[in-house]
Amino acid sequence: MTRRLVVIGNGMAATRLVQRLVERDPARFAITVVGDEPHPAYNRIQLSPLLAGEKTAAQIPLLPAEWYTRHGVCLRSGEAVDEVDIQQRRLRIAETWLPWDELVFATGSRPFIPPLPGIDRPQVMPFRTLADVERILAIPGPAVVIGGGVLGVEAAAALRRHGGEVTLLHRGSGLMAPLTDAFAADELRQQLEARGIRCVLACSIAAID
């Protein structure tokens, strides 16, 4: 008997899971995918090239829309799960209850937002989703990137490609630690500064004005 499988999340892991399930046994599950982003599933790794203008939004979807229709997968984009009832095996989306036999959480991670005064200003935003990229690109002028990890470095480099002033703030003494040693971190800093990116290391942020 076909079982009802609901996947909460429409990111890269969820999409790959659904693809494999359909490939292995298309009749085993009636699959529903629920994702709170209004866009089709996309390659999140490509957000930095998108921010830099090297890619377009049309180039980063993981699957075409017709794939879901062709394989009988129900895709509910732009919808958030408000409640999960484990006992009755159902979940609530707004006022609608959706039953399931098997449930998969594939929601991914969330960026850490430091609890700083001024963090809620409209010009302050994370760098995690396609909507974040659209919001960042909509605001002209100098940019400050908080965090010198992989995404922070990529975001700073991408923003600099647009010609604006970019400052990268990092609380550690070396960029992209622990992926880099002291020599590599310093070489990376020099490369960024050669591109015109100001790097401020070993700093702490008290507030955003």
Language model feature labels by segment:
Residues 9-12, 128, 146-151:
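Glycine-rich Rossmann-fold phosphate-binding loop(s) that bind the pyrophosphate
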Residues 34, 78-80, 127, 150, ...:
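Conserved beta-strand termini and adjacent loop/short-helix elements that scaffold enzyme active sites
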Residues 113-114, 153-154, 177:
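Glycine/Thr-rich phosphate-binding loops of Rossmann-like dinucleotide-binding domains
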Residues 2-74, 158-179, 183:
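Beta1-alpha1 glycine-rich phosphate/pyrophosphate-binding loop at the start
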Residues 1-6, 61-144:
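FAD-binding core/adjacent interface of flavoenzyme oxidoreductases
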Residues 75-92, 98, 162-209:
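A Rossmann-like FAD-binding core segment of flavoenzymes
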